[in-house]
Amino acid sequence: METEKEDRKTDRIEKEENKRIRKDKNEGIRKDKNESLEKEKKNGAVNRSVTAVILMAGSGKRMHTEEKKQFLPLCGKPLFCASVERFISWLRCEELLLVVGAEDKETVEGYVQQEGWRKEKKISIVEGGAERFDSVAAALHFIEEKGNPENYVFIHDAARPFFTEDLLERLYKELQYSKAVIPGIPVKDTIKVERDGIVEKSLDRKTLYAVQTPQVFDFQVLSRAFKSFLPRREEWKDKITDDAMIVEEFSKERIRLIAGEEENIKITVKEDLRFLKEKHKNFFPF
């Protein structure tokens, strides 16, 4: 019995020590990046910060669990924490908006306070809507009223926890060439167009990409597109599946596509999370 207690105590001490080492390492990396960022600003290379909009108002029906997928456990924390902490650690990000269902506002606020995130970034909780575009529209309204409309907007699905800071940096730097940038990966499977159980044609997969998030925009471009879209919401609601589509259809802005990340998948079923947790045991700093 005493031996078991000692073993548990030793394990706890080792975990705390490893956590401290990771924290010290991350703080060192952050200091180096901060110095590099300051140099960029002095050279005029950087003049706009980022507002991250993390969408987590969905019900996650395909998971077939009582608990919403954004709250499923990942490395001892709810799934959405991974995305929040990735943006918090990214120095270009100035503020985060967590867009949640009305019934989850209190729960998410509890996690924000528990983790002490507001010590590092400005964080606001915004009530989302029934559809994805309703949630994004709520975030844009908040930014226009209380946030910083001069910032770039990075819209990200909380159900995509396995994205890297390298992707964020590449998206940010691409904004010097375009006011709308999205990541994607080439489609590997052959895609067929079907009608009533009959294949009509095959699509050229060399031109097809599976699009991911974060999708990033100049705030004014995205805001204007949404203001044009919302009056026609009912007409378009079954066709719109991401933010870029609204910019495609309701603005003249051309959207730039860059290479995404293979592991940046959207968790839609339990098996996705189980597989990725095992494959990336050391991906998260917690």
Whereabouts are the PLM-identified features?
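Short helix-capping segments at alpha-helix termini
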Residues: 91-92, 114-122, 146-147
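Conserved beta-loop-beta/alpha segment of the NTase-like Rossmann-fold superfamily
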Residues: 122, 130-194, 212
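Conserved alpha/beta core of the MobA/IspD/sugar-nucleotide pyrophosphorylase nucleotidyltransferase superfamily
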Residues: 2, 210-286
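Short, flexible, basic/aromatic active-site loop/helix in glycosyltransferases
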Residues: 193-217
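Residue-level signal for inorganic ion chemistry
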Residues: 54, 80, 139, 157, ...
